[in-house]
């Protein structure tokens, strides 16, 4: 392995966090390929090919040739979330080119949820749950003393490519315009000054007349923006995971109303939902934040850093390639090289903060075991006494019923006497005589 190299098939790898987040720790020396891939001869010292480019003919053709020879392992990197329109409604994307199937030996997925979807496309045994190394340094504390109590800062963001044709762009523009119109009518919301922070792409900011007149490359880093806001609205994008990872209440902004591979606790799919959703983002219910956190752990492997898993996966693939070439056999791989993250996801079952989920229920506010034991003992004692008390009350009720029966009989007798007297004097009785008891016991 000492003489082998890892070849990255991406011209801009040295400036992309998809690669720079782990390249310096690579178990093999890294070489970035900037040649035209269909004409690129695979070097003899290639220990592994790594790329996230899996869309165009150039990459797919080069990957297929190497994959068919089955001597040099290919690792495909997932660079973010799956987006429904990008998969199925992208007019410039060749049908089936998005991992249907994967043209490689393994795909480094960002989470279990993504792995399940891609495996359903005919990729059994190819998906490894790695995570996103570039997010390893994101703080998950959710605490920021710099945030103001009288100001609500809401980030409105779009994906780098929010639309794939003119019709989709029109819908995206409609959605962000609806947010702007709503904010203009609500400068103060829920007793707090509303401040929108815009992070739009595809020329939407100047078209709306929002944001700063700054070139995209000169913008404040997204990580710093996320650290300064209270909540996030975003079109389908990996921004969602970056936001949720920071424990920010986060909603999808999707007027396309497309299926979502990642479920969100909040979604705005029409303008009449803005007020109610933003109201909850400003004061998020605990149960929705718990659901948001649950989805995060399913969609992003983040219980432990992703970089060590990626490096382990690279080493495992390189070893398998070496063994195949030494023995003149095809590369053979287990269905899972990495098992830790999936096992961790299955084992996770941390207790919930029941008091936070039900803030209005004072019963759950008491977490003193001794006090709870005393109250439970008293409750058990009280329950033991109840059958005797109920028996006494039943006796008293039976006595009252007998007294009521006697009173009813006296009233009936008096009524019949009055009727008889009226008849005797020729006066038509107001009511006929009562025959028997008008009321009967339930028994």
Summary of predicted features, one role per range:
Residues 7-138:
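Active-site and donor-binding regions of nucleotide-sugar-utilizing enzymes
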Residues 283-391, 395-405, 409:
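C-terminal amphipathic helix plus adjacent low-complexity
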Residues 198-246:
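Donor nucleotide-activated moiety binding/catalytic core segment of transferases
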Residues 388-443:
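Helical coiled-coil/dimerization "stalks"
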Residues 19, 135-207:
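Conserved catalytic-core segment of nucleotide-activated headgroup transferases in glycan assembly
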Residues 19-20, 41-43, 117-121, 205-212, ...:
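Short loop/helix-cap segments at secondary-structure boundaries that form the rim of catalytic
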Residues 238-302:
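Catalytic binding pocket for nucleotide-activated donors in carbohydrate/polymer assembly enzymes
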Residues 72, 231, 247-251:
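Structural loop-to-beta junction motif characteristic of Rossmann-like glycosyltransferase folds
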């Amino acid at each position: 392995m000492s003489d082998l190299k890892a070849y990255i098939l991406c011209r801009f790898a040295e400036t992309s966090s998809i690669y720079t987040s782990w390249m310096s720790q690579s178990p093999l020396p890294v070489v970035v390929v900037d040649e035209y891939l269909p004409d690129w001869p695979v070097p003899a010292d290639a220990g592994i090919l790594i790329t996230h480019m899996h869309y165009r003919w150039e990459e797919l053709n080069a990957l297929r040739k190497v994959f068919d020879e089955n001597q040099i392992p290919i690792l495909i990197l997932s660079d973010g979330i799956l987006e429904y329109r990008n998969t199925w409604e992208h007019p410039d994307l060749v049908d089936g080119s998005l991992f249907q199937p994967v043209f490689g030996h393994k795909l480094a997925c960002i989470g279990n949820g993504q792995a399940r979807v891609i495996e359903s496309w005919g990729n059994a045994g190819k998906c490894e749950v790695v995570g996103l190394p570039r997010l390893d340094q994101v703080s998950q504390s959710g605490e920021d003393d710099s945030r103001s109590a009288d100001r609500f800062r809401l980030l409105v963001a779009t994906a780098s490519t929010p639309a794939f044709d003119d019709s989709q762009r029109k819908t995206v523009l409609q959605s962000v315009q609806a947010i702007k119109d709503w904010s203009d009518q609500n400068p103060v919301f829920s007793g707090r000054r509303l401040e929108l922070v815009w992070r739009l792409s595809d020329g939407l900011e100047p078209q709306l007349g929002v944001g700063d007149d700054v070139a995209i490359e000169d913008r404040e880093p997204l990580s710093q923006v996320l650290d300064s806001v209270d909540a996030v609205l975003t079109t389908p994008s990996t921004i969602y995971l970056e936001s949720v990872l920071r424990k920010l209440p986060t909603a999808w902004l999707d007027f396309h109303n497309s299926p979502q591979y990642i479920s969100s606790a909040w979604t705005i799919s029409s303008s009449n939902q803005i007020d109610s959703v933003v109201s909850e983002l400003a004061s998020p219910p605990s149960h929705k934040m718990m659901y948001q956190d649950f989805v995060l752990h399913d969609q992003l492997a983040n219980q432990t850093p992703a970089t060590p898993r990626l490096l382990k996966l690279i080493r495992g693939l390189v070893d398998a390639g070496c063994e195949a070439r030494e023995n003149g056999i095809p590369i053979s791989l287990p269905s899972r090289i990495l098992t830790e993250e999936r096992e961790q996801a299955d084992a996770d079952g941390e207790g919930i903060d029941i008091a936070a989920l039900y803030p209005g229920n004072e019963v759950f506010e008491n977490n003193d075991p001794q006090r709870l034991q005393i109250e439970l003992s008293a409750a058990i004692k009280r329950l033991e006494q109840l059958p005797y008390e109920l028996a006494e009350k039943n006796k008293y009720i039976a006595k009252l019923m007998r007294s009521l029966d006697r009173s009813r009989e006296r009233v009936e007798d008096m009524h019949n006497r009055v009727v008889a007297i009226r008849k005797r004097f020729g006066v038509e009785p107001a009511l006929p005589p009562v025959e028997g008891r008008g009321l009967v016991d339930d028994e």
